[in-house]
């Protein structure tokens, strides 16, 4: 562990170059404003430790104010030692740090979801709470270029459509997330820590094949890299194309919605055809809006409508970034294609069940999405 906050000019040249590459990525690709306040999500692993070091080195140049949070998931016997490591790291880097406890097993048992999903949900919820407490503009995460490759495969197995299939966003203003290291190789981050004499914690659960992400990283990705040694570079190029396409579609859809806005309703009293489900909050895409759009644009509007009903506080007509892990917010491509086919053929009596307790149906050339609630 370093004894005092480091300075960029005092670290090895290779380490300094990496930091400047991250700075360039933050300024040119992420639009990070000078003077930003960032909350760092730190686990003590190599990625998040490198995140803390790099941003601390860049803080004077970018006029950053840094805070940190370590979430103790309580899933491993040495999780308390991980949190203690993060506190010591932040003390040496002169970064204020808090530790929050997460009852992952309790959420998993009460909600009927997996441990991995429960941990992710609680972690992001606690990060958002802490962000608000410390007044940070964004939460900085330690995802790196290798995580993009894993994420693309995860999304592929979930049936995620394009451009969300291209992987996680480097900046997500809806959830106030920032990923400064997303263009940086994982080994380069470890080399940085070694060059600066900083250790990190190893999480043994990262080697467990109990979790899908680990199975993909440990078993599937090595096979794909044998077939294509440049796989990570290829998937990063895919990620870049996805970001361009996403920006284009957001601009196009925002323009269309400015002319013919969607209609948000608070629900209806009558029961559905099933007679056991009442209408909850609804969103209608008007016929005049849909009639002038290409099917590709309509499909993206359907996805945006689903996200709005799942996340009404952030899902209006803003950026349509995908939410990895929030399966209920990811409408399956097959269902949306069937919905659009029914619209094109004028089949108005068909109802479509979507993830997250949502339903869609046609009404006079319009498409209505609604959240279903149990009938009284």
Regions found by a protein language model. Name each.
Residues 2-222:
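Core alpha/beta nucleotide-donor-binding catalytic domains of modification enzymes
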Residues 2-47, 67, 102, 122, ...:
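AMP-forming adenylation/ATP pyrophosphatase catalytic core
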Residues 218-219, 223-235:
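Conserved anion/nucleotide-ligand pocket segment
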Residues 158, 162, 186, 225-229, ...:
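Alpha-helix boundary/capping and short turn/kink residues
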Residues 206-213, 234-243:
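Internal, active-site/partner-interface "lid" segment
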